[in-house]
């Protein structure tokens, strides 16, 4: 399968690390490196399993995390344990990474604040100097806000893979039949149009074959990017539901 999807929501490895820190409710000043490294590598592995274009900077960050983890696991010399001067001068291997994360979080928050201000400003119109109502056009502002991130979608897909792995029999017959992304997109759209109600994310993965699971997930991302479906999540880390947009039902 030679299909690749580029997702704009992937802003870089620091963005992924912040997502994991928030998800796991970790103190950014005291990061458990072993745990965060495991979760980070799982996400990168999932991206590569989906044949997404994983930028080299993600792999560099993975190597950095592994390096920090190994440095923290190295045993200290016995004489160093009682050397107060050594303890004062010893640097935390996580220090540089923590500083980068805090700096990135600050700029990310500022960028989000500016974006929200821009959206609010677009909803306001200055009073015209004269009556131009005859020439005014009605402008419909879009109120749709995507609250579900690609990282949330990846997390949901990981649950699908884990559940299918548990339910899969010990011996399976692998089918090499390739499924075009466009065909699976059409199937999902038809399913949403016929149901006329929201569907649970898991409902779109009825088959066990890995190829079919990957194609289905990529099809969902494409439909999401093209605003043909609406992704809903009541609160963080809850179940994800999918409904067809007006564009689907009006077609």
Swiss-Prot record:
Pfam families: SMC_ScpA. GO terms for cellular component: cytoplasm. Its main location: cytoplasm. It is found in: Cytoplasm. It comes from the Bacteria. GO terms for biological process: cell division; chromosome segregation; DNA replication. InterPro entries: ScpA, ScpA-like_C. The keyword Acetylation does not apply. Keywords: Cell cycle, Cell division, Chromosome partition, Cytoplasm. Participates in chromosomal partition during cell division. May act via the formation of a condensin-like complex containing Smc and ScpB that pull DNA away from mid-cell into both cell halves. Component of a cohesin-like complex composed of ScpA, ScpB and the Smc homodimer, in which ScpA and ScpB bind to the head domain of Smc. The presence of the three proteins is required for the association of the complex with DNA. Belongs to the ScpA family. HAMAP family: ScpA (MF_01805). This is Segregation and condensation protein A. It comes from Bacillus licheniformis (strain ATCC 14580 / DSM 13 / JCM 2505 / CCUG 7422 / NBRC 12200 / NCIMB 9375 / NCTC 10341 / NRRL NRS-1264 / Gibson 46).
